Amino acid sequence: MTKLEVCCYSVDCAQIAEKAGADRVELCCGQSEGGLTPSVGALMQARETVTIPVHPIVRPRGGDFCYSSNDFTIMKNDIARIRDLGFAGVVVGVLDTDGHIDMPRMREIMSVSGSLAVTFHRAFDMCQNPMIALKQLAELNVARILTSGQQQNAELGLALLKDLVAATKDQGPIIMAGAGVRLTNMQKFIDAGIRELHSSAGRTVPSTMRYRKAGVTMCADSDVDEFSHYCVDGEVVEAMKSLLVMGAPLAKHT
C-alpha cells in the first residue's frame, strides 16, 4: 500500500499526524524557508512522544544546497546527533556548484548516518540531469528520493516521476512524490504507481494571543501575519490515509 509521509514543522504537528494515521513524519522547522533542521529540544521531544518513524531534516539554512565548510560540518554533527538519539531516518541533500550530486560529501553523510534510512530531499529537483542523479543516489544506497519531478509541484512533474518509478522498479531508491500533493490530486500519484507520498496536509490557524501589538514584527517581511501559524490538519491526514487504503489495489510496485 502507498505510504503517507507528513511534513511537520513542530512536535505538536507530528503528534497530530500520528493520531490521524500518517505512516511517517518528516520533522522540520522554518516553514517559510522550506524546512530547516529542528532544534535539539524538538528532536528530544519527538523521540519521547511520537511512536511512528520520524525523519528529521538536516538543512542548516534556506536557499541553495551547496554548502560552506562550516555548514557541512554542522550538518554532519546534526546527523550524528539524530543517529545517536535513535531516529529511524534522516532527510538531507548536498549539491556541487554545477548542480550535480556532491558525491564526496554525500559519501561522508552516508558514513555518518550509519543505520539511518537516508532520504535525499528536493535538492534532487535542482539537479542538472535527474537520471544521472538517480544513478548516483542508487550507488550511494539512499533509501528514497523526495521529488516533485523537477517541477514547481509534483502534479506538473508526473511525467518525470513515472520515469523515475520505472527506472527503480526492480531496485534503487523509493521515489516519494512531494510538493503540492493533496487529497484532491493524490489519486493521480496512486495510479502512477508511486510508492510513497509526502504532504504537509496543513492549514493556517490563528494565534491564541488576545493582545496583539500593532506595528511591530519579528520578521524581515512586515507583511507576514505573525499572529497565525501553519499546522497539520488531522482531518485532512485521515482523509488522505483513507483514500490510500481504498486505493491500495491500484498502487503498483508496492
Curated annotation (Swiss-Prot):
Q: A single Gene Ontology molecular function, please?
A: copper ion binding
Pfam families named among the record's database cross-references: CutC (PF03932)
Main localization is cytoplasm
Gene3D superfamilies noted in UniProt: Copper homeostasis (CutC) domain
Entry keyword annotation includes NADP? no
Query: Which InterPro entries did the record assign?
Result: CutC-like, CutC-like_dom_sf
Matching SUPFAM superfamilies: CutC-like
- Membership in a protein family: Belongs to the CutC family.
Q: Which HAMAP family match?
A: CutC (MF_00795)
What NCBIfam families does the entry give?
Answer: PRK11572.1 (NF008603)
Recorded protein name is PF03932 family protein CutC
Annotated organism of origin: Yersinia pseudotuberculosis serotype O:3 (strain YPIII)
The root-end lineage is: Bacteria, Pseudomonadati, Pseudomonadota, Gammaproteobacteria, Enterobacterales
